[in-house]
Amino acid sequence: EIGLAFDGDGDRLGVVTKDGEIIYPDRQLMLFAADVLGRCPGQPIIYDVKCTRRLAPWIREHGGEPLMWKTGHALVKAKLKETGAPLAGEMSGHVFFKERWFGFDDGLYAGARLLEILARAVDANTVLKALPDSSSTPELNIAMQEGEPLALIDELRRQAHFEGAREIITIDGLRVEY
């Protein structure tokens, strides 16, 4: 028992457990990555900067190379093509399968792949609940003029003190990992 939801044009997947728990796209990517890497070990798996910090270690643990990239459908799709990665995804729910598919985002296909993975389990709910969960700051958008975003990020890097930060990432905006 699982709930699958699709956006209006069918290119994004939403997942809800039988208990009503939302399985956010970065957690969906964990299942997809483990499955794909079983057939394509050592390959890069692309994810956008909005995904939580739990995804990269999961990809490594399952034999892949995590590759964080900029947010945006076209940007992720271009990176998939550039790298030849078998899988990419965004926190928005866009999942791009190159392995056994055509390299574009298709929510219905992603749903079918998820059902294929879960069909191998005795209890799908147990599989979904076992995925590591994490909290993250939602995307913050500030209205700005052309050129201002990069200047703001530079200024934040100069003036802000991110006490205890493990890493500061500026691939697309500002991401601080602790």
What are these regions (language model features)?
Residues 10, 22, 91, 95:
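Gly/Ser/Thr-rich beta-alpha loop segments that engage phosphate groups in nucleotides
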Residues 8, 20, 28, 50, ...:
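Short, ordered loop/turn segments at secondary-structure junctions
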Residues 12-29, 55-56:
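Short Gly/Thr/Asp-enriched flexible loops that form oxyanion-binding sites at enzyme active sites
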Residues 6-8, 22-27, 101-106:
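Short glycine/threonine-rich catalytic loop with a Thr-x-Gly-x-Asp
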Residues 26-44:
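Ser/Thr/Gly-rich flexible loops in soluble cytosolic domains mediating phosphotransfer, phosphorylation
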Residues 1-16:
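N-terminal small/polar loop signature for handling phosphorylated ligands or for N-terminal nucleophile
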Residues 38-178:
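Phosphate-binding and adjacent anionic-ligand microenvironments
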